[in-house]
């Protein structure tokens, strides 16, 4: 696919651009390492549990459950996770896009209401819950927020890839 090749070509420099703020804030990652690990892990777990509960309450099928599980990770990873778990990839993509856009739109307000004002916490929240679209918002808030959001995209994606085969057995 010619169009996908062009898109892939642009992803490499975009990924490097996300790594630069993280590299500049490496000292914060070292300082807050445990909090970072707990935050991202609990964010991924909370997402999985909330999807599980929503599927139970709404009477949704196993297919819908595994379709929605990767909603908070990037589209490229989420599509593969959904397909491998037996989900409906098109619906997964839609749920990922909606999650990112909503996170971008209301994330800052939610953080203010929750009285979360630490830049590291803000970045982790945006990246873990709203992936690349949330990271765009986090970068707009500051370099620390953007760096932590970039990190959490990668780690949340990895944890989700590991967790989905386990979580998919529950419904």
Predicted regions and their residues:
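Alpha-helical transmembrane segments with an aromatic anchor "belt"
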Residues: 32-41, 57-68
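Alpha-helical membrane segments and immediately flanking helix-loop junctions
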Residues: 64-91, 97-98, 113, 117-155
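Helical membrane-embedded segments and adjacent short helical loop/helix-boundary regions
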Residues: 1-20, 28, 32-35, 39, ...
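Hydrophobic alpha-helical transmembrane segments of multi-pass membrane proteins
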Residues: 7-10, 37-45, 93-98, 121, ...
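C-terminal ends of transmembrane helices
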Residues: 18-31, 107-115, 134-141
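Transmembrane alpha-helical segments of multi-pass membrane transport proteins and ion-pumping complexes
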Residues: 13-21, 40, 44-56, 75-79, ...
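Helix-coil boundary and interhelical linker segments in multi-pass alpha-helical membrane proteins
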Residues: 52-64, 83-91, 168-171
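Transmembrane helix-loop junctions in multi-pass membrane proteins
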Residues: 1, 21-29, 57, 86, ...
């Amino acid at each position: 696919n010619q169009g996908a090749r062009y898109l892939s070509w642009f992803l490499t420099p975009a990924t490097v651009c996300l790594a630069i703020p993280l590299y500049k804030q490496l000292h914060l990652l070292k300082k807050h390492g445990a909090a970072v690990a707990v935050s991202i892990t609990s964010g991924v777990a909370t997402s999985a549990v909330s999807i599980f509960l929503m599927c139970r309450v709404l009477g949704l099928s196993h297919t819908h459950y595994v379709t929605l599980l990767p909603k908070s990770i990037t589209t490229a990873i989420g599509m593969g996770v959904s397909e491998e778990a037996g989900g409906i990839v098109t619906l997964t993509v839609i749920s990922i896009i909606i999650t990112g856009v909503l996170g971008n739109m209301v994330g800052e307000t939610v953080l203010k209401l929750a009285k979360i004002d630490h830049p590291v916490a803000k970045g982790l929240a945006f990246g873990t819950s709203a992936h690349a679209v949330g990271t765009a918002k986090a970068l707009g808030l500051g370099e620390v927020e953007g760096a932590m959001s970039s990190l959490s995209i990668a780690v949340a994606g990895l944890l989700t890839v590991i967790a989905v085969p386990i979580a998919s057995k529950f419904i």
